[in-house]
Amino acid sequence: GNVTGADNVVSWQTGYPFGVNFSRGYPRFNPGEFTTVDTLSNGDADAAMIIASDPGSNFPKKAIEHLKNIPVVVLDTKSTDTTKLAHVAFKTATYGINTGGTVYRMDDVSIPLRPAFESPFPDDETILKAIKKRVHELILKKNDSRGASGEAKVAAAVNPL
């Protein structure tokens, strides 16, 4: 993954660099409590979606043990310790080789990338959009949305009055 890029996006969106919790509907920053390692080690996560990262090979044992006990979805370009423990694993195209985008160097310099050649596998964005669409369909099927449509319909189903 591109840790610096992920940190830059979180900082841009919230003002905090990492360790951000959105469970109350707004960002809260506490790196001793809300980092991925803390959340998993404390047993606070009820599911995990892991993208282009392999915590199964380098997180503390307590965090990995919790991952083994919750639903885990992984998107990665290769087989890893984390894809092996996942309930669902998607093999994806490699960004910067098969897909375009932007990565950030460790000194925060952005580098635009163009695809060098095609992949038989979908990119992360395609998979994430398909997952979002299916989750919305399941939410709407389960809940009455009171006549709303689109995103409002999903919001009404998820947050009933």
Regions found by a protein language model. Give the residues of each.
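Non-catalytic alpha/beta scaffold blocks inside enzyme catalytic domains
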Residues: 1-161
